[in-house]
């Protein structure tokens, strides 16, 4: 299904009162009204997430940031705050990217040894935590590269009760195929020689991603075809995937939008929006997410 959203509304959201029972309190709480969780993962690292408590009888919502970002990134923060007004429990994790207790975004030139699979294990940690709080299912929302993560997680863990995936600004590979192929060949060669040194790669928006071969290859694997394959598998499982994109997003093109139309449950284009970096279309996006959540909830409520 293909829909266009042109709603000009910029509605004010009623603040939600949240019980301030916190596992850790920072001097400045970056997401309005959210508590900040700091939990230790099985590998010993501390993992950080924004958390807003909601109705345990409804699916919890996990909101994941884009590549190398955090829940403090403006787009992610807006999504978390706006969804919280609907009464859902929200968790917005920071992927650690190999750094215990990571709070800030990570630079492209920083040393990267983390992998895509490491990220999926951390998502699984937070989904497990939500299940322990009494939520029977979860809805996964990803922004930008966070969409690849939630697709990968849902595909590789078919027994996890994911009610739906919402991919906001689902990007395609941003490097030309010859460039990507050359980089992959070099990284594979280094890996075969057991060369674990950090080397520069072009990846996502990074012109210089300083990563180990294993780190780079784990993300480079998620090219356009890999995303389409994931969407196809979820389509075969009849698991709904909703894509929301901006009509002025320079990181997408018409060819990619047509691919999404073929493989996602529903694609919504918000007129005038870019990668949702601007707050100008914040409430248009919020309205669309609210409508999608109503669609997801309808079968469960027998409507």
Question: Which residues make up each language-model segment?
Answer:
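Bacterial N-terminal signal peptides
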Residues: 19-28
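N-terminal cap/lid segment of alpha/beta-hydrolase-fold proteins
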Residues: 33-54
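Short, surface-exposed "cap/lid" segments of acyl-processing enzymes
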Residues: 56, 61-95
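Short beta-to-alpha linker loops that shape the active-site pocket of alpha/beta-hydrolase fold enzymes
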Residues: 94-101, 171, 273-274
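Cap/lid segment of the alpha/beta-hydrolase catalytic domain
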Residues: 97-114
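The alpha/beta-hydrolase serine catalytic core
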Residues: 111-114, 160-264, 268-292, 296
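Alpha/beta-hydrolase active-site loop
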Residues: 111-132
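Gly/Ala-rich beta-loop-alpha elbow adjacent to hydrolase catalytic centers
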Residues: 142-146, 150
